[in-house]
Structures are given as structure tokens and as C-alpha cells.
């Protein structure tokens, strides 16, 4: 059975240890890699702008509340770079299930059971839920996932709202949730199983066969169908009940003054909507944040491993910001809490400086041009963090289903 971490004190202690070690790795990398700060390269300094007085904040909050309480067409235009195919942030749409895998309660029941079953993995110890736990925002609270074998270590992204993503995984190697399920199961660095093993497990247990028969009547047990069942379940894991969503539904009091100021910062001065836009707060595209560990033991080329295009070196998919406060640590490295990420973005990140022997290296990573020093003050950063907190969903507790065993009768009673 899957062992869940829960909400106890052990998780923060473990996270602190992991993040301390991760920070040491980053510092060692930065200490041995020539860098240039963006403000230095521009010939200036990233000086924080003056903070507002309490009276000025109150006046600004009242002004913004009058603007943002209305239709989105009244909102001020966001600060967007030329060429960005931008969409306004807002409520989630309805989930569209593909024609090749229509929604059914029977498939969801089978998929949920498979999702929580560690016996699908080659070790018998890793379930999908091991890295995507409901009580941890459908992530796992770790800096990086614990793979079966050494691989580029990456943070486990939440699967909440994955139904709205066109490409899955940090490098976008899956083009559908069905592909994501199949690849997670068979990847030797993840669950490391085989289609035959999964099919054999389900075929050999009477209650699993009964669940399968309900989901796929009169069809033989296949790996493809089982992946469809898990994907069907994953498409039911959606949000849309955050305080931001309440605000969008017309509850003007759902956001505090600080959160409202943070919303305006998010769309404008902080430049967040260049990449984090649309209903899921992600453009679904790939960007280089300067965190690929170029030339180091932990180098991770990201999207390049999928496309082979040198322009994709160091690029990773923009993560959703919905539930971001519950799915820390953040970035594909899993090395940062929210405050650290905001501070890095405010500084414009750092830019690797090519050394002479790297001048013609086609695999030298190039940081996203959207990352620029912002000159935000600590008050601004606190307001931004406050707004991002409004994207948090109500805590979701889902009890794992009773897993079918050889001793069960064939009744499909495990939903």
C-alpha cells in the first residue's frame, strides 16, 4: 500500500534538509560558473522602488477594487513582451474528454484504483500516488522525485488541472494524459514496469477483472485501455474553487487589499503574465530560467532531450501557478520555496557568461528574454505572494481505495 507523508512535522524537517543540500549544490555551481547579473550587464542597478505609505496603499487598493471587480474587459492591459501569444487569466473552463477516451464513471473507478496501486511498478513499492498525493496538492512535497534508478532529478509537478495541458512532463515529451500514464509506468527511471506486468496483474485478480469489465465491456485487458482508465481518472482532478475563482465569480470581498494589489502587480509590473497566463496560469511553452546546471554533473537539458533542437537546451515547461503555495518546493529542480523564486525573478535571475572555449558551443543555454530585473520592493514581493496564495484550492483529502487482492470476490465494490 502507498505510504503517505501526511501533514506532520516530518515533512517540513525533511524539506529543510533537502533544500539546504540543494542550496549548497546551487552555490557550488554558481561559485564555479562565470555569471553576470542582468542589471550589471545593462549598466545599471536593480534598485527597489520606494514603498507606499499606508495611506497610499489604501488609496491604490480602492482604485484597483473598482477596476478589477468588473468585467475583465475593463482591466488595465497587462505588461506583455512583443510576440507573446497571451491569454487573460481567469476561471477554468470545462474539461474536454477526447473522443478516443470518453468519460465514464466505471473508467474513473478503475483508473483511481490503478493510480493508488504500487504493485503496478517493478519494485511493487511505487504507485502514481507516491509522487502525486492528494493531500499534498497532487505533488509529493519532495525537492525531487525518488526514481528507481539514477536520472536527471526533477521535482514532481502537480497533476491537478493536467487535463488542460497540451504537453506533459517538464520536457513536454507526452502529448496526452494517456501517453503520460504509459511513459510514467514504463520509464525505467520512474515506475519501471512493463505492459505485460500491468496487464498480468489486472487479469489475475478477480475484482480487477470485474472493474475492467465495467469500464471496457467485452474487451480483452490491454495496457492501452488501462492507461486510458488512469488518464480518465486524472481528468477529474481539477480545481476552480480557490478564492481567486470566487473573486472572478463576482465576490469582490474574496481578495484582501494586499492580494488585489498583488493581482495588479502580477499582470503588470512583475511581468508574470508573459509566461503565466490563461486559466491555468501557464502558457504551456518552454523557457530557460538559467537553472540547467550547464557543464555540471547535474546538467539537465530539458526540452532539448525531446526535440534535439539546440535552442531548447535548458528549457522547461512553464508550470501552473494554481495551488503553487501547496506544491512547494518549486521549479524543476525543486530547490526553492516561493519567496526564493520571487526574489530570483525580481533580480532577473542570473545569466551564464560564455568563456572563450564555449563561444561556439551550440548547446550553451540561453536564458529567456522575458526575465529582466523588476526593481520590486519587499512590499511588492509580499503582495505578489499574497495574491499567489489566493490560487490555493481547498484542502482535498481522498482516501485511497481498497486495492483488489486474490482473496477478493469478483464484485466490483472498490470504488
Give a label for each model feature.
Residues 7-13:
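Short, Lys/Arg-rich N-terminal segment immediately upstream of the first membrane anchor
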Residues 16-25:
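Sec-dependent N-terminal signal peptides
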Residues 2, 6, 17, 29-415:
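Periplasmic c-type cytochrome electron-transfer domains
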Amino acid at each position: 500500500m502507498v505510504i503517505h507523508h501526511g501533514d506532520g512535522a516530518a515533512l517540513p524537517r525533511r524539506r529543510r534538509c533537502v533544500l539546504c543540500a540543494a542550496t549548497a549544490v546551487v552555490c557550488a555551481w554558481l561559485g564555479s560558473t562565470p555569471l553576470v547579473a542582468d542589471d550589471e550587464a545593462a549598466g545599471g542597478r536593480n534598485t527597489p522602488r520606494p514603498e507606499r505609505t499606508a495611506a497610499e496603499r489604501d488609496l491604490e487598493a480602492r482604485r484597483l477594487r473598482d477596476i478589477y471587480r468588473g468585467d475583465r474587459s475593463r482591466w488595465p492591459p497587462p505588461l506583455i513582451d512583443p510576440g507573446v501569444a497571451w491569454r487573460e487569466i481567469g476561471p477554468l473552463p470545462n474539461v474536454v474528454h477526447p473522443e478516443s477516451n470518453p468519460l465514464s464513471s466505471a473508467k474513473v473507478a478503475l483508473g483511481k484504483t490503478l493510480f493508488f496501486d504500487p504493485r503496478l511498478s517493478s519494485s511493487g513499492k511505487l504507485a502514481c500516488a507516491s509522487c502525486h498525493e492528494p493531500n499534498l496538492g497532487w505533488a509529493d512535497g519532495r525537492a525531487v522525485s525518488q526514481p528507481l534508478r539514477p536520472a536527471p532529478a526533477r521535482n514532481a509537478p502537480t497533476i491537478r488541472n493536467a487535463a488542460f495541458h497540451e504537453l506533459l512532463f517538464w520536457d513536454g515529451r507526452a502529448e496526452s494524459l494517456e501517453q503520460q500514464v504509459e511513459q510514467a509506468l514504463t520509464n525505467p527511471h520512474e515506475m519501471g514496469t512493463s505492459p505485460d506486468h500491468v496487464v498480468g496483474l489486472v487479469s489475475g485478480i478477480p475484482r480487477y477483472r470485474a472493474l475492467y469489465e465495467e469500464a471496457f465491456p467485452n474487451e480483452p485487458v490491454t495496457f492501452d485501455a488501462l492507461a486510458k482508465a488512469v488518464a480518465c481518472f486524472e481528468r477529474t482532478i481539477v480545481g476552480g474553487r480557490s478564492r481567486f475563482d470566487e473573486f472572478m465569480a463576482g465576490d469582490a470581498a474574496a481578495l484582501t487589499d494586499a492580494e488585489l494589489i498583488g493581482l495588479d502587480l502580477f499582470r503588470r509590473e512583475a511581468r508574470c503574465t508573459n509566461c503565466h497566463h490563461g486559466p491555468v496560469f501557464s502558457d504551456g511553452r518552454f523557457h530557460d530560467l538559467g537553472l540547467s546546471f550547464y557543464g555540471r554533473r547535474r546538467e539537465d537539458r530539458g526540452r532539448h532531450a525531446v526535440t534535439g533542437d539546440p535552442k531548447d537546451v535548458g528549457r522547461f515547461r512553464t508550470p501552473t501557478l494554481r495551488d503553487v503555495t501547496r506544491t512547494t518546493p518549486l521549479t524543476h529542480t525543486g530547490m526553492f520555496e516561493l519567496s526564493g523564486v520571487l526574489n530570483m525573478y525580481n533580480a532577473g535571475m542570473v545569466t551564464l557568461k560564455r568563456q572563450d572555449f564555449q563561444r561556439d558551443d551550440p548547446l550553451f543555454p540561453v536564458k529567456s528574454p522575458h526575465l529582466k530585473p523588476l526593481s520590486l520592493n519587499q512590499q511588492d514581493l509580499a503582495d505578489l505572494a499574497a495574491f499567489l496564495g489566493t490560487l490555493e484550492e481547498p484542502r482535498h483529502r481522498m482516501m485511497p481505495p481498497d486495492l483488489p487482492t486474490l482473496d477478493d470476490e469478483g464484485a466490483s465494490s472498490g470504488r
